[in-house]
Amino acid sequence: MSFFHRLSAVVVIASLATACASAPPRPVRSEFEDIPVPKGLTYEADRSTIIESPQVKAARLVYRGRIEIESLAAAMRTTLEGNGWRNVSSTTTARHGTTQVYEKAGNSLQVLLWEGLWYTYVELTASRASQLSR
């Protein structure tokens, strides 16, 4: 690996390691713009799925980053509630991490947060009914 590739890798890792969970959020996907994702998380396209039909849109969106899980869970709750989502329940276990469940105008959202060996993962599972034109 060349010096510049190593240097680039170090810069990327350092920026991810110093990312703050309370940084301004960015939208997840255009279909789910009211579900913010804190900066410092990278979208994992190969682990994610988006399903669209005439009646429903659903998604399983996976992100990862190097953010402390407790501050990430708090940031997720704060930003989601700021976007009108109502927290229905929240559970934390040592084995399975944190699960947060939200609802908003008949739409549902489940947030799973867990720690892997190197990264903290966030899985957003959302569904919403499509507005049918008449």
Language-model segment annotations:
Residues 6-13:
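Sec-dependent N-terminal signal peptides
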Residues 17-19:
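C-terminal motif of bacterial Sec signal peptides marking the signal peptidase cleavage site
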Residues 2-6, 21-134:
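An acidic-aromatic pocket/loop used at catalytic or ligand-binding sites
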